[in-house]
């Protein structure tokens, strides 16, 4: 039932989404673009793509948060990039960074603004909600989700892209599609270099 609703584009705010469903939404938006660029799907549970360049592999993948989807605050995912000598996600890498490392200042500003817009649209739980009736630390931790990000993200921020409904996932995927093309283009150039790139792990 959930997958049928997802394919019809009818996931609404607060409606639980599994990571597999999130990956399917993203895949529908980006797969043809990267297939045309010579990328193949990686193995495993996460949504990833790889391309062999000489004896190197350029890889990128999407990874949902390990925390379960919350009715009020949704969930998050990140995007990671890797240049390695094998096609396995998370294998020993020559270069590996999450998305923030490669973003421009304008992109960082946009993502910060987008996160704040999503937070503004999140419903607040009733006073009898379980997490609000635990310790003060847990209550503060949960309510922090509703506080606006005051400082613009930077290249060292571990950016997690929040979603509370299917619309958010689609918008993130559309926004990052061309950014990912730019980043993998840089990694492809490194892979085509005659000399082995310096090892850089982020």
Please give the residue ranges for each predicted region.
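Intrinsically disordered, low-complexity regulatory regions enriched in serine/threonine/proline
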Residues: 3, 7-29, 41-43, 48-202
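Acidic, metal-coordinating catalytic segment for phosphate/diphosphate chemistry
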Residues: 34
């Amino acid at each position: 039932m959930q997958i049928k609703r997802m394919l019809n584009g009818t996931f609404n705010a607060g409606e639980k989404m599994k990571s597999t469903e999130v990956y399917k939404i993203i895949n529908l938006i980006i797969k043809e673009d990267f297939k045309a660029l010579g990328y193949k799907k990686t193995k495993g549970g996460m949504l990833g793509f790889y391309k062999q360049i000489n004896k190197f592999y350029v890889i990128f993948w999407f990874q949902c948060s390990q925390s379960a989807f919350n009715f009020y605050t949704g969930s998050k995912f990140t995007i990671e990039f890797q240049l390695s000598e094998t096609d396995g996600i998370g294998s020993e890498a020559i270069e590996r960074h999450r998305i923030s490392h490669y973003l421009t200042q304008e992109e960082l500003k946009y993502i910060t603004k987008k996160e704040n817009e999503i937070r503004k649209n999140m419903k607040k739980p009733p006073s009898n909600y379980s997490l609000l009736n635990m310790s003060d630390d847990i209550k503060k931790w949960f309510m922090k989700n509703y506080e606006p990000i005051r400082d613009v993200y930077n290249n060292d921020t571990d950016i997690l892209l929040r979603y509370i409904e299917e619309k958010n996932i689609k918008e993130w995927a559309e926004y990052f599609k061309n950014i990912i093309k730019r980043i993998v283009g840089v990694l492809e150039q490194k892979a085509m270099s005659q000399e082995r790139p310096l090892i850089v792990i982020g």
